[in-house]
A protein has these predicted regions:
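Short, Lys/Arg-rich nucleic-acid/phosphate-binding segment
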Residues: 36-38
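Conserved S-adenosyl-L-methionine
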Residues: 103
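Glyoxalase I/VOC metalloenzyme domain signal
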Residues: 1-8, 12-34, 44-100, 114-126
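Acidic (E/D-rich), amphipathic helical modules within compact regulatory domains
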Residues: 41
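Short, small/polar residue-rich loop motifs at catalytic or cofactor-binding pockets
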Residues: 106-108
């Protein structure tokens, strides 16, 4: 029988790992735990999964919502919030940090945001 394997890191490609990691540090209050040329990892004491940022000079931001023939998002992160009031507070904070609220929203249970490199992410109450 195989030993269980856990997710350790979620890595986002981007052109500038430093600026994108700085955005997530401000927004989430996480700490930088690793940095070398082209890769930065962030961690939180309350979360076992780290978020990483990897330099990819050929990175093309996804279009959201998806459009035929355009770069599609391949994965996105959902950040858990306590309730609707906490979600609204985090949306305002994310905007102040440099995110944009997506024009298309499909539920009151989550809010879709776009980070400075174009990656969609959500705050959700699920």
């Amino acid at each position: 029988m195989l030993e269980q394997v856990l997710i350790g890191n979620v890595i986002l490609d981007c052109i500038d790992p430093k600026s994108l990691s700085d955005f997530y540090i401000r927004m989430l209050n996480w700490e930088k735990t690793y940095e070398d040329e082209g890769v930065i990892l962030l961690a939180s004491a309350s979360c076992s999964v780290k978020i990483g940022f990897q330099r990819n000079l050929d990175y093309i931001p996804p279009v959201w919502p998806e459009l035929p023939g355009m770069q599609q998002m391949q994965v996105h992160m959902d950040f858990k919030v306590r309730d609707k009031a906490h979600m609204e507070s985090m949306v305002e904070h994310a905007i102040a940090c440099g995110a944009v609220k997506a024009k298309e929203q499909y539920s009151e249970l989550w809010t879709v945001m776009i980070d400075p490199a174009g990656h969609p992410f959500c705050f959700d109450t699920l």
